[in-house]
Amino acid sequence: MSFLRPTLALLAVTALVTTSGQLNGYSKKEVTPEDTELLQKAQSNVSAYNSDVTSRICYLKVDSLETQVVSGENYKFHVSGCSVNSDKELGGCANQNCESSKYDIVIYSQSWTNTLKVTSITPAN
């Protein structure tokens, strides 16, 4: 019977990790330099945009981040940013004095296939 204790403890921890902090499948995450680098890499590369993503913005700062584990990972960046007129202006804003708004940028990453896609850019609610 004592061999069941570690197994039950592992199951309890797994259930806790699986269910904790999930709202619509997303969990809040502290923004790391690696997360910001991922945002910059995807958001500044127009070929990484899904064809239905027509918004073009630069970002001033990352306000917060949520992640969702799927067949890879979805990153929902809540950013302050500005509309831009050309793909050359994507990524971090060169003009720090632009008229900013709040946006949500969702990036899908699957590291084992080197997939990095901007799946949506929407005005934040």
From Swiss-Prot:
Coiled coil: none annotated. Residues 1-21 form the signal peptide. Glycans are attached at N45. One of its GO terms (cellular component) is extracellular region. It is found in: Secreted. The record marks G25 as: Reactive site. Keywords: Glycoprotein, Protease inhibitor, Secreted, Signal, Thiol protease inhibitor, Virulence. InterPro entries: Cystatin_dom (IPR000010), Cystatin_sf (IPR046350). Induction: Expression is up-regulated during infection of host tomato. A motif (Secondary area of contact) lies at residues 68-72. One of its GO terms (molecular function) is cysteine-type endopeptidase inhibitor activity. Belongs to the cystatin family. Interacts with the host papain-like cysteine protease PIP1. Interacts with the host papain-like cysteine protease RCR3. Interacts with the host papain-like cysteine protease C14. Secreted effector that interacts with and inhibits the pathogenesis-related papain-like cysteine proteases C14, PIP1 and RCR3 of host plants. Inhibition of host proteases by a pathogen extracellular protease inhibitor forms a specific type of defense-counterdefense mechanism between plants and microbial pathogens. This is Cystatin-like cysteine protease inhibitor EPIC2B. It comes from Phytophthora infestans.
